């Protein structure tokens, strides 16, 4: 039996698009929210809009440009992407998931929605502290207390690695769609991406692992 409704924090990337198709299997009504936070590539927002339109879903786009004004990182500034082993990479945007989920919760409450879906993942979390399960659970409690509302933050990818995320997309009948239409690349190239940035490396490594495992099955 499907739950009634869900709001997805949606970027148009591999993870959030996989969550979209997951939600379509589990909810009667699905809405999307995308945040314009001064990201390098406004194409991300256009990709999210296009996917929402193709799927016939209500899509909210919220201005969060203030975030880009108060943080310096490789996603909102024209600086080189760096990822030193054992350190948080400079693609990390301080407060991003905290703020996105908080504003998504405000919107969800106004829409009468309880479930908020986000594609964060601890297995392949790239060193981002706000992708951890402990953070999401803590924020869920905080939001419920702050707004006297019984939100449920759903994280269907939390314990999946990238290969398993590809497998889930395939199980949902969305493998080709995710592979061809999503934007994960930090350099703004849809689909297979640039092949050089950390996001592309993670995505491609997961894809190759999944296809190898699928071939052996």
UniProtKB/Swiss-Prot annotation:
Substrates-to-products reaction catalysed = 7-carboxy-7-deazaguanine + NH4(+) + ATP = 7-cyano-7-deazaguanine + ADP + phosphate + H2O + H(+)
Source domain of life: Bacteria
User: Its Enzyme Commission number?
Assistant: 6.3.4.20
The pathway entry for this protein reads as:
Purine metabolism; 7-cyano-7-deazaguanine biosynthesis
Q: Which residues bind Zn(2+)?
A: 185, 194, 197, 200
Designated name of the protein: 7-cyano-7-deazaguanine synthase
| GO MF terms, alphabetically ordered | ATP binding; ligase activity, forming carbon-nitrogen bonds; zinc ion binding
The gene name reads queC
Tell me which species this is from: Streptococcus thermophilus (strain ATCC BAA-491 / LMD-9)
């Amino acid at each position: 039996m499907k739950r009634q409704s869900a709001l997805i924090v949606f970027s148009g990337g591999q993870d959030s698009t996989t969550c979209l198709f997951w939600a379509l299997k589990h909810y009667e009504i699905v809405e999307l929210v995308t945040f314009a936070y001064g990201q390098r590539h406004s194409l991300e927002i256009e990709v999210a809009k296009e996917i929402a339109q193709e799927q016939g879903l209500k899509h909210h786009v919220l201005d969060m440009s203030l975030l880009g004004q108060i943080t310096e990182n490789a996603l909102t500034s024209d600086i080189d992407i760096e990822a030193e082993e054992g350190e948080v990479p400079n693609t990390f945007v301080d407060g991003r998931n905290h703020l996105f989920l908080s504003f998504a919760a405000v919107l969800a409450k106004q829409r009468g929605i309880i479930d908020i879906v986000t594609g964060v993942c601890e297995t392949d979390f790239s060193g981002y502290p706000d992708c951890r399960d402990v953070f999401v659970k803590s924020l869920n409690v905080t939001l419920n207390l702050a707004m006297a509302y019984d939100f449920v933050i759903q994280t269907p990818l939390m314990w999946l690695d990238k290969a398993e995320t590809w497998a889930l997309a395939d199980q949902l009948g969305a493998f080709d769609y995710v592979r061809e239409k999503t934007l994960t690349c930090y350099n703004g190239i849809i689909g297979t991406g640039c092949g050089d940035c950390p996001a592309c490396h993670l995505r491609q490594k997961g894809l190759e692992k999944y296809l190898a495992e699928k071939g052996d099955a």
